[in-house]
Amino acid sequence: MTDALSHAQKESLFRDGYIVLKKAVSDDLVDSALNRIKSAKKGEYIGPDEAMTNLINASTITPILHDAMGQFDPPNTCQIGILKKSKPGDHFNNLGYKDRDQPYYGASIHMDGSITISAPQEIQRGTPDEVYANHFASGPKGNLGRSPEVMGHNMVPMFEDPAMTLSLGSFTAFAFVCLNDQTKPGCGQTSLLTGAHHSMEKFFQWQRSVNDCLGPEGPGWPRLDYNVPNRCGMVYIPPTVQESFCDETSESTPDGRKWARPDQILMEPGDACITLYHIPHSGSRNENGSESRKNIIFRIRNKKRQPNIQVNGVSDHPDRGQMGEWLEFEDGNDPWERSKNAMCNMWDEWDGMQDIVQAHQGNPSS
């Protein structure tokens, strides 16, 4: 495996929003990570263990990202993405539908950095305002109304900034490292909406042009959908983006709603998938696998966005602390404006992609 993307791979990353790197991680590093997972005690969090962080820090992924993206903090922790085998369930998912009714192995395509409150398992009653208030009052910090102090069960704030103009955390790149056989569909793979990073960038630009409010509760993006079976579904990507990726082949839920078909990323142990922050994505149900799905997930931010802030490799809201704490920034440094700039200009933090990007500028079909 080389230490840099080829021109063709960079073209693919530009077009699709992701690239799969075959055998980016050595067998020794994969085995060390698997052994650490196997030896973990019940309830033990092994994200900070060197056997896990070395999947990035001691593999070719680091020089590849340095070349394509730029400098970043070496991850000191990660998300241990283990999905046990399961059959379609009768519980409501975060979109407000029964798990068994959600197409594409239950994929709930979303943007990272968005608050999630556990899905109500009973049909919600009341007006939309009442459903909204009750839903977010059920979060871990209780009833704080509509506020940047509200935290989700995923420990993401409702809003990133005090003025409540930014409701998404952001970073630069994902790295998903595969530790088990995921070469056939339905094994819990990460699913990606190929090419939708372009649509998300344009949508953020449009939101900013309307009223400078980006993310859910900004223009064209409601936070909740009250017309789903449980009357309280998270709207994880803008409806116009979802609809633009639907066609006659798209599968539907029983209410007739079509859903954009994501691509399941088929990988072998040691493969890695690098994506832009901007690409909508999801895990999926491990229905056909012979074992638990094991993906180790890293979130990477180009160091130039906030040189004085260390990013830990797992947070999807690094302008706030991991648990939502307010961070201190020097005078003149508006972190939320910097993040809005990055969300509206997705290639600005990909230093090694600039020749590719410039070659495609002015070409709408790219």
Summary of predicted features, one role per range:
Residues 1-8, 364-366:
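Basic/polar N-terminal segments that are highly enriched at the extreme N-terminus
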Residues 3, 19, 23, 319-321:
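Helix-turn-helix-type domain boundary/helix-start signal
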Residues 5-8, 13-16, 25-269, 285-291, ...:
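Non-heme Fe(II) oxygenase catalytic core, chiefly the N-lobe of the double-stranded beta-helix
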Residues 268-271, 276-277:
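Catalytic cores of PAPS-dependent sulfotransferases
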Residues 278-282:
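Short, charged beta-turn/beta-strand-edge "cap" motif at the junction between a beta-strand
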Residues 329-366:
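Intrinsic low-complexity, glycine/proline- and repeat-rich
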